[in-house]
Amino acid sequence: MKLRQLVLAATVAVAGLSSALVSTVATAQTKEQFFPVLVYRTGAYAPNGVPFANGYVDYLKLVNARGGINGVKVSFEECETGYATDRGVECYERLKGKNGGATVFQPLSTGITFALTEKAPGDKIPLITAGYGRSESADGNVFKWNFPLAGTYWVAGDVIIQDIVKKVGGADKLKGKHIALVYHDSPFGKEAIPILQERAAMHGFKLSLLPVTHPGVEQKSTWLQIRRDRPDFVLNWGWGVMNSTLLKEAQATGYPREQIYGVWWAGAEPDVKDIGAGAKGYNAITMQHGAEKGSAVVKEVLEKLHAKGQGTGPKDEVGEVLYMRGLFSAMFGIEGVRQAQEKYGKGKVMTGEQARWGYENLNLTQPKLDALGFKGVLRPISTSCADHMGANWARIHTWNGSKWEFTSDWYQADDQIIKPMVKAAADKYAAEKKLNRRTPADCQS
């Protein structure tokens, strides 16, 4: 009898200990803010996808090195999409419920963004598409869960035309000019078309649309047409190997690189480094940042991570264009959580729904950005229920044969053109999906 009681007591004690251990583990897990990381480190777009992923992951590591988000440490898990929409959706489904639930997804693909836009509201997980994705999702009154922070492709297209206007000596000088858009034949590439058509109608220039099939290595027919028509300017809405191919074709055709403008996914080191001096004069838009090797945040990453063997990827790529894009995209994800903690509790893990409120109420002032190490890199970003973009500043940088350098002042996209376009497209989406615009009460939730 005594033996039985001792065994029973021991069993209860072990059960209690196990319960305590499970509770401790669960508590430890819930004290981490989970960020799924969709990447493409393999495939045709890997040369551009890898540096972005390295910058993104390094910033998450840096946050932990700084002590977390008000003490809450960050956890993350990568999932390889290969830039394929179906694989991106698979990654979303696999990671959305992990480690207490996903905070936010950043698809790094307009195609994946379109697919997840349909899923995120039901799962109550926000999407950040910093400088890409659906341009009309800047309208937060319709797209409650989408945040194209810092700009959209319509902002990019508008600012490129503004720089061309300056180059030709005024808007009136655009009349009769010919601009050719060479674009990746995908949702990403097609995003440029509406704003350029709008500007063409305003200024009276001819717009030619020249699609290029994935992945973009076959452009012979495109450049035969450009050689024949000799447009005044060529816009490159490319990604991955399409960009270097385009510049090589331009070189072979004798088309002046000074008259070519790339979207910001076509204006990084992998796009030009193999061509070097042959790409000199090529322009690309930057949604605020460029290569920022001298920035405070880069110095901190090198000191706190790479100097200790904890960095992600090659040390000499830290601060390059796409690395910086990953870095600042991760920063947006973190700062939305920090903002949410102001409402829902400092030092607490935020749900995706709570984080969404943070992204909708971002107020990244210049002093805040400077304190985070982004002085001279980013301008203030402030979102609201109606405005999920938060800023519309951009610059042009130009390849000088060995590095990118800024060649323009700051531009702001023309809201008189873009806002009506955004509203019309958002209204069309709402009608198709049978959605109502958000009420003031919903905006406060």
Which residues fall in each region the model found?
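C-terminal segment of classical bacterial N-terminal signal peptides
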Residues: 15-25
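Segments of small-molecule ligand-sensing domains
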Residues: 310-323, 334-409
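Extracellular/periplasmic periplasmic-binding protein-like sensory domains
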Residues: 250-330, 411, 425
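Beta-alpha junction/loop-to-helix N-cap segments that form part of ligand/metal-binding clefts
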Residues: 32-34, 47-54, 66-140, 149, ...
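Signal peptide-proximal N-terminal region
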Residues: 54-76, 169-172, 201-204
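Periplasmic-binding protein-like
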Residues: 95-108, 126-130, 178-183, 209, ...
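Venus flytrap/periplasmic-binding-protein-like
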Residues: 81, 127-129, 133-138, 215, ...
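Extracellular/periplasmic Venus flytrap/periplasmic-binding protein
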Residues: 86-90, 135-136, 144-254, 292-299
